[in-house]
Amino acid sequence: MHIICKSQCGNRAALKRPKTGDALCKECFFAAFEAEIHHTISSSNLFRRGEKVAVAASGGKDSTVLAHVLKLLNERHNYGLELVLLSIDEGITGYRDDSLETVKQNRDDYQMPLKILSYEELYGWTMDRIVAQIGRSNNCTFCGVFRRQALDRGAKLLGVDSIATGHNADDIAETVLMNVLRGDTARLRRCTSIRTGGGEDTIPRVKPLKYSYEKEIVMYAHYKKLVYFSTECVFAPNAYRGHARAFLKDLEKVRPSVIMDIIYSGEQLRFKDTVKKPERGTCTRCGFVSSQQPCKACVLLEGLNRGLPKLGIGKKSKGERMIAKQNQELALRERANLVKNDF
């Protein structure tokens, strides 16, 4: 027995949407997926007519679908945007060099200008060399910090008004979980924000795919026959995010709505005024956005250049600092009791 598309178009259903459970034909799925992203963009006022927007392009499924859909919606709904691709070459042999070929294919397919910036030219280091120095235990710390700043540098060079990133609903739910588990209230405050930055000296970042499920992004790319790079980073298996992702997938099997539930919970969180929130300013060394002086990128880079690669990555988690404080207080009390007993 054939299942008919729920939208009552009369066509046979080709898939079941992971997000809603609806059985849809391909064309109705495309329409629903694109309409939801358009709603996200318009309801959140992510763009203004005449703006120049850099799409952070990695060649993966998320950035490829983002570039495709933004181009389509820009033309369909007359956003009036100038779209460009911005890609970062971290210098990972067997991964980024191959994925950049996909980015170049995206450039040709969507007829968008492409700017590629490398860690080598920005910092004088590649991730291959960094991993050779530090091993694989903290490589994601270096890469994440450098990549975020590299996007800011590239955006400034291109003179764009905002950076559109391919963060999807799964990514955001994972980040909420990670920040809860780490006790990182500062990041927990902003990790669900659809727009970040945008101060006097910063270029805002927006997440048009914030409410798009990863499974649906893969389905969209598959049925649209989009060209994307699907190999995982060779340094990623040890990443903390991978554990949060595995946990989220297990939860999703039991409760399909858990991704949106976690995002909603993150959006509704409130913190006491006494919780210290780090102020985001400008690094006195490099001039880019930072919540510390000097910025994390400058500290890590200084460590590499001085032959001290562990510099800047030894900070304890909130929980570890709390345990250390409790132990210190306990030791002081025990010492005080010993002194009292001596008398």
UniProtKB/Swiss-Prot annotation:
Disulfide bonds: none annotated. GO terms for cellular component: cytosol; cytosolic tRNA wobble base thiouridylase complex. Disruption phenotype: RNAi-mediated knockdown is lethal in larval third instar (L3) stage. GO terms for biological process: protein urmylation; tRNA thio-modification; tRNA wobble position uridine thiolation; tRNA wobble uridine modification. Its EC number is 2.7.7.-. This is Cytoplasmic tRNA 2-thiolation protein 1. The gene is Ctu1. It comes from Drosophila melanogaster (Fruit fly). InterPro entries: CTU1-like_ATP-bd (IPR056369), CTU1_C (IPR032442), Ncs6/Tuc1/Ctu1 (IPR000541), Rossmann-like_a/b/a_fold (IPR014729), TilS/TtcA_N (IPR011063), tRNA_thiolation_TtcA_Ctu1 (IPR035107), UPF0021_CS (IPR020554).
